[in-house]
Regions:
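Cytoplasmic membrane-interface regions of multi-pass membrane proteins
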Residues: 25-44, 74-76, 107-130
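Long, highly hydrophobic alpha-helical transmembrane signal-anchor segments
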Residues: 1-3, 46-91
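Hydrophobic alpha-helical transmembrane segments of multipass integral membrane proteins
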Residues: 17-24, 60-61, 93-100, 104, ...
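N-terminal signal-anchor/start-transfer transmembrane helix
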Residues: 5-36
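Juxtamembrane boundary at the C-terminal end of a transmembrane helix
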Residues: 147-163
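Short, strongly hydrophobic alpha-helical membrane anchors
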Residues: 1-8, 161-163
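Loop-to-transmembrane boundary segments
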Residues: 44-58, 125-147
Length: 163
């Protein structure tokens, strides 16, 4: 049983990458009715799905590279950037890069409008994400929460396996 648990944790990044791909595939299937009704939306949805694979998949690929090639023993080690492990630091820099990219997209590159046009119809969205201003408010909350989480990882010591 311990072997199965260790195998799961060692390959967690691969499972997360697979779930990311599955989510994108499901959203693509949901979008098909919108593309059929309005074929001019096809290019925007294509950009959306490739963007999602990049934005949501890159951190898991970086983590997997660190585990398989870099000798990081398990995904839990990525919660302790203070170790100075270059693969763990690269993972955290990747997150910061993606947050900056997401921030620029939402606030300066019409990402909020794109979100309302392409993503809001795919899901039962909250009232906030039905307008570009609401998307920007939700993005600010999300970016703020992520920043608090990242700073917490750098400032506090968390006991755990291998720490």
């Amino acid at each position: 049983m311990l072997f199965v648990i260790n195998l799961f944790f060692y390959h967690f990044w691969l499972l997360a990458l697979g779930i990311t791909g599955l989510n994108v595939l499901i959203m693509r299937l949901w979008a098909q009715k919108f593309i059929t009704a309005q074929p001019e939306l096809a290019e925007g949805y294509r950009q959306l799905f490739w963007g999602m694979l990049f934005y949501l998949g890159l951190p898991w690929l970086v983590m997997g590279f660190g585990i398989v090639v870099g000798g990081v023993p398990a995904p839990l080690y990525f919660l302790d950037p203070k170790t100075g492990n270059p693969f763990v630091l690269t993972f955290h820099l990747t997150l910061v890069f993606l947050w900056l990219l997401g921030f620029m997209w939402i606030y300066f590159w019409d990402g909020a409008e794109f979100y309302v046009k392409y993503i809001t119809p795919l899901r039962r969205s909250s009232i906030l994400t039905r307008s570009p201003l609401g998307v920007k408010i939700m993005a600010a909350i999300s970016f703020g929460a992520g920043l608090i989480g990242l700073v917490t990882l750098w400032l506090f010591d968390f006991p755990g396996p291998g720490f």
